């Protein structure tokens, strides 16, 4: 089954507004390809529109965890902002592999690394410097470390541990929301 574009776009726009984004910022995301990008190269929702669907799923999970655990974010928009923009760098991370693509509805992607670093740090940079959206320390660190300790070693692991000590509940909730979305809600789905 394919992702229902019209419903998905309306849901995403509503959540982006709940994140405190204005219409110009949402238009910029549209221009970047936020509503068309895949969520991954080949794992979960590796189809056009997968990124926005994954972001909706993460936001839904993060808002539910925020309510259930009575988490204290710096502002009511925070879980929406973090959930919807945690992977924004992926608008530039996956490029259609024209040599491997035979079906436009199920393209193959190649990875394009970011000059800003890993996708957590790169998403923070894009949100703050390119979209010019202000993030609180909690929001920035939740986006930066939404992958948890996966693949970390050395100084980066120490940095994660330091952030985790500062905002343990918010970082763990964001990581959990991302993992539940990718590995439960989207399990085995290239598309919906």
PLM regions: where:
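Non-catalytic interface/linker regions that flank or bridge core catalytic/transmembrane domains
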Residues: 1-37
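All-alpha helical catalytic cores of prenyl diphosphate-utilizing isoprenoid enzymes
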Residues: 25-31, 44-56
